[in-house]
């Protein structure tokens, strides 16, 4: 009797497990792995977001570091040698070159010096209400009658003296001006050999 009772109990327990197994919902193995496979996508989105924010940050750093520190002394130095240029023209060019020497060399090489975007220079009016600059030549060198010979005499520059071995950082302000004019004249002489349009401006 005891053996029969044990067999009956074992059969009932086995039947319960079989019923639960058939009653449980079956999921495809790929469906069980789906939540795990979605995690890398979320991680990639976070990485892309972080990367784009880092990119914007680096762009801001580049734009901020590209701004040059232009001092009033730099503008005044250029203006003392080239009084025809407006301070805003000088400032705008210095923001590109960052160098007094390069700005002055650009001028003597006949480069254009535009005003900053959005800036309108004030025009002086004469007594009859007309602008003084009407019918004036557009080239700033012609308006101010600035010629290489004028600068040579103004700064007492002797072109027969070789100044190529001088360092501008070791010179006083007056000697720096002489060196800049000397270098600009030498560069202009080289360019005049091939640039007929520029040569016509200083005739």
Curated annotation (Swiss-Prot):
Ranges annotated as biased composition (Polar residues): 33-69, 123-132
Cytoplasmic topological domain: 26-203
Membrane topology, Lumenal segments: 1-4
SMART domains assigned: CUE (SM00546)
GO biological process terms, semicolon-separated: ERAD pathway; establishment of protein localization to endoplasmic reticulum membrane
Membrane topology: Single-pass membrane protein
Keyword presence, Phosphoprotein: no
Keyword entries, A-Z: Endoplasmic reticulum, Membrane, Transmembrane, Transmembrane helix, Ubl conjugation pathway
Annotated InterPro entries: CUE (IPR003892), Cue1_U7BR (IPR041158)
Subcellular location as annotated: Endoplasmic reticulum membrane
Principal location class: endoplasmic reticulum
Annotated ranges, domain CUE: 70-112
Keyword Aminoacyl-tRNA synthetase recorded: no
Record-linked PROSITE patterns: CUE
One Pfam family named in its UniProt record: CUE
Residues passing through the membrane, by range: 5-25
Region (Disordered) location: 29-74, 123-144
Domain of life per record: Eukaryota
Family note: Belongs to the CUE1 family.
Quaternary state and interactors: Forms a heterodimer with UBC7.
Function: Component of the endoplasmic reticulum-associated protein degradation (ERAD) pathway. Recruits the soluble ubiquitin-conjugating enzyme UBC7 to the cytoplasmic face of the endoplasmic reticulum membrane where it functions in degradation of misfolded or regulated proteins localized in the endoplasmic reticulum (ER) lumen or membrane via the ubiquitin-proteasome system.
Protein name, per record: Coupling of ubiquitin conjugation to ER degradation protein 1
